[in-house]
Amino acid sequence: MTKVHYSRAPENSTKSCKARGSDLRVHFKNTHEAAMALRGMPLRRAQAFLNHVKEHKEIVPFRRFHGGIGRAAQTKQWNTTQGRWPVKSADFLLDLLKNAESNAEYKGLDVDHLVIEHINVQRAAKLRRRTYRAHGRINPYMSSPCHIEVILAEKEDVVSKPTDDAAPKVKKESKRKQRRQLARGEF
C-alpha cells in the first residue's frame, strides 16, 4: 500500500485532526453532493444533519450532479430546487466523522468546537461486473466507489457583529450619481 496523501494540508496541524476512507463501496456522485453540503459546518451540526437526511427531515442539495434529479420543497433552504436523501452516503460520512472525532479526542482537542475545515470526495477505481442481455450479449455493470477525506479544525467562538447603534452606516453612492453631481456642481 502506498503512502496516503491528503489533497490539502490543515492550516494548523496542532488544532486539527484528519480521517480518511479509501475505496468505499458507496456512490461517488451522491457522496460528493452530501460532502459539499457539510463543508464548513460544525461537527455536531453535521452529524445532526446527516441523521436528519437518513430520516428524510432534511435534504442534500444536488448542485453539480443534478441531471435527472427530481425537485423537492425541502431544497428551498439551500436556494436550489433539486435534492435527494442519500442514506448510504450519510451512513459512510457519519462513520468517517465519528472516526475523526475519536482522533480529535485522542489528540486532546475540544470536540464541541470542531468545524469541518476540509472535506473531499474523489473517484476510486471502478469495479466491474456483468449483466446478461438479450440475444446472448453481455453489458458491463460497473460500480463507482470513492475515497473520502475530512479535516476537522478547532475554532474559537466567533466574535459577534457590533450593533447598528455603535457605528453609523456610511451611505455609499453609485459612481454614476457621483459623476452626475460633479457635472452639476453639487459636489
From Swiss-Prot:
Gene Ontology BP term (one): cytoplasmic translation
Lineage: Eukaryota, Metazoa, Ecdysozoa, Nematoda, Chromadorea
Keyword Ribosomal protein applies: yes
Residue stretches of biased makeup (Basic and acidic residues): 159-171
PROSITE patterns reported in the protein's UniProt record: RIBOSOMAL_L22
Organism listed in the record: Caenorhabditis elegans
Protein name: Large ribosomal subunit protein uL22
Gene Ontology terms, MF aspect: structural constituent of ribosome
Region (Disordered) residue spans: 159-187
Recorded GO CC terms: cytosolic large ribosomal subunit
InterPro entries registered for this protein in UniProt: Ribosomal_uL22 (IPR001063), Ribosomal_uL22_CS (IPR018260), Ribosomal_uL22_euk/arc (IPR005721), Ribosomal_uL22_sf (IPR036394)
CDD domains to which the protein is assigned, alphabetical: Ribosomal_L22
